[in-house]
A protein has these predicted regions:
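A composition/biophysics-driven feature that prefers long, compositionally simple stretches
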Residues: 1-157, 171
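Generic secondary-structure signature for well-ordered alpha-helical cores
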Residues: 120, 149-159, 163-170, 179-188
Length: 229
């Protein structure tokens, strides 16, 4: 959070309102139905300016958001989401005098428009999508450790495919063997991708004629995919 606050300050942005589920998980520790306000370093609402610092406004579940953020050891405030027409006033009482930036490159326009209107008394909301990406692209030591651990799981997935593979085994059966390893290690089953409208499966195995069929996915692997026929 301090690093992000510094990046906001360097970009000349007073603060950020984060709402993309993946980024809520990264900055707040969970992905409840919420919006997280992070003030720029030294800007209104920041601790340096006499404010209370970052705050997570939660619609539901407040109790789970507190738990996921560390409960009594939470590095930010966790509050009930106020009424939208009172949102700018709530932020103003926290010392915020300029509209925070929104993730226009991530969330649907109809969703962001609601916040643009609600925050309009504080001014125009800039786009902070690139600032978020700038921090997320630099992986922490912990993230690097998790990537190495994930690579070990991936290796065991390949070994599972090798163990069950043979004549007459379908591509879906091979994928199931690989994903069984992934799920047993705690994978939730979904890979979130920022680029709309891409989606990604944990395992894709293609062979024969199916292997030569292209798809919309930005990858060398296509295939027919699962279908009723």
């Amino acid at each position: 959070l301090p690093i992000f606050g510094r990046l906001l300050s360097e970009a000349g942005v007073a603060g950020a309102m984060l709402q993309h589920p993946v980024d809520l998980y990264y900055y707040a520790g969970g992905r409840q139905n919420a919006s997280m306000f992070i003030p720029a370093q030294g800007a209104g609402g920041s601790i340096e300016a006499g404010g209370n610092g970052p705050v997570l406004f939660v619609r539901r579940s407040l109790q789970r958001a507190l738990f996921e953020a560390g409960d009594s050891d939470c590095p930010h405030e966790v509050l009930v989401f106020p009424r939208m027409k009172e949102f700018s006033e709530v932020l103003n009482k926290r010392g915020v005098i300029s509209a925070p930036g929104l993730q226009f490159g991530e969330v649907p326009k109809t969703y962001s428009d609601r916040f643009v209107n609600a925050l309009s008394p504080l001014g125009d909301c800039p786009d902070i999508t690139g600032i978020v990406h700038a921090q997320r692209e630099v992986k922490s030591l912990w993230e690097q450790e998790q990537m190495n651990a994930a690579a070990d799981v991936q290796l065991r997935m390949f070994e599972a495919v090798q163990a069950v593979g043979g004549e007459g085994i379908t591509e879906l059966e091979l994928v199931a063997a690989a994903e069984a390893v992934s799920r047993s290690e705690g994978f939730g089953g979904h890979i979130h991708m920022r680029r709309f409208p891409l989606q990604c499966d944990r395992g894709v195995i293609v062979a024969g004629r199916a292997g030569g069929i292209p798809s919309f996915f930005d990858s060398a692997v296509g295939g027919t995919g699962a279908h009723p026929l």
